[in-house]
Amino acid sequence: MEQLTGVLDKIRVIKYDPLMIRFTLTTIHKSYCCIVAKKELATKILMLEDGKYNVVVNGHYNSRNQVVVSLFKVRNSDHITKLIGF
């Protein structure tokens, strides 16, 4: 399981049924393409603003070299992330 820390950016919906989203995690060294298939987690991430939040992501790589996110935490919480439940 890979743990990455960086800035959440370019959040997009891939599929609506079942809900699947992608986002770019920009670290100091590299940008990672991440996907989320868990509906509850994807719904919460869609409410976040691009380029504003520093996050920690745990997951594994799929065959397309994308990080499949299993755990997601916001490091710089504010009132919006607290309302959402991060």
Name each region found by the language model.
Residues M1-D17:
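Structural detector for short beta-strands of small beta-barrel domains
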Residues V36-A42, K73-N76:
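A short, sequence-level motif marking secondary-structure junctions
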